[in-house]
Amino acid sequence: MGLSKGGALLLTATLFWACSTAKHQSLVGISQEVSVRRDSWGINHIEAKNEHDLFFAQGYLAAKDRLFQFELWRRKATGTTAALVGPAGLKSDIGARLLRYRKDMDTELNHYHPNGKAIIEAYVAGVNAYIEETRKNPALLPFEFTLLEITPGLWTPEVVISRHNGIRSNAEQELSIARALAHVDAQQIKELLWFHPGEPDLSLDPSIDPNWLAADLLELYQAVSEDIPLNALLDLEEMPEGSNNWVISGERTQSGFPILANDPHRRIALPSLRYMVHLKAPGWNVIGGGEPVIPGVSIGHNEHGAWGLTIFQSDAEDLYLYELNPENPNQYKYQSKWEDMLLIEERIQIK
C-alpha cells in the first residue's frame, strides 16, 4: 500500500496472490506511504514509515476482514447485545456496564506500552475509517449485517481495553475458596491447591456471613464472558478450557537455540479467535497472531525473540462483599462508616 501527502493518504494494497496489478486506495488518516501485501494464506504484511500509520492500517485491514466479529465484540463491550438478540442478552449487557472501566483512561492505555494511548487511538481510527466506508457504501457490509438488519457502530479505545473481560476468571476461584472456608480450615485448602509464590492468607473477613456466599454472586460477571446467543450460530457443546506453555533451554536443543511452546486452548470458531498479521515500521518488525480486535501481536516473534499468551491460574482479581445499610440500600459500610454509592443510570434497549 502506498500513501501520499496532501490531505488524503494513498493506501496501495498489493494483492500478489489475487491479481497481477497493484491496487491503490486513498485514505484520510495516515500521513505517509503504507504498503500492504496479502499472502496466499490471507495474512497482511503491513509496512509503514511511522508507528501511527502502522497501527491505523492494522485496524483498517482487521476491520475489513472481520467486521461482523468486530461488531459482536463492540456490542459485548458496550452492553448493547439485547438490542440485537432480545432478552437473552440482558444479563450480559448489565454485567458489561457494571464492569465498565471508569478510571484514568490515559494511564490505563499507557500501561500496555509507553505509547499505548497513541497506538490504540491509531488502531481505533483505522477501524472507524473502514466502518465509515461501509456507511457510504453498504454493499461492502458482510451478509450478516443485512441478515440481522443492523449496521456497525463506531469504536472507542474503551472497547479495545474491555477485551480483558475475555481473559480473566480469578473471581470465580476467589468465591470457590471462600465457600470452602465456610466448611474446612485454610490448611486443608492449601493441601488441595497449589499457591506460588508465598503463603496466602486465606482467612475470611470475620464480618462476612458465610451464608452470603451461597448466593449466585457472579451471575452478571459470568454473563459478560458468555457468547452472544445468536440462533443462526451452531450451538456446540462446551469443552473444558485450559492452557499450557513451556520453554526448552538452548542447552537441551540440537540447534542450540531455545524453543518456546505456547498452547492457548481456544476453541475452533469461524471466524477464528486469532488474527495473523505482520507489522513492520521503524522500531517494529513482528509477525504472529492475536485477538482480532486488539492492536499488535500477542503470540509471535521478531528478530530477537518469541513470546506467547496463555491464561494462568493467577491471582488477578479480588472479590469484595459489602454490607448494605438496611435503612438505605444505596449505602454500604466501609471502615465502620456508611458511604453513599455513586448512582449511574443506564438505559438498555431490548429487541
List PLM regions with ranges.
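Short Pro/Gly-enriched beta-strand edge/turn motifs at strand-loop
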Residues: 227-233, 274-283, 326-333
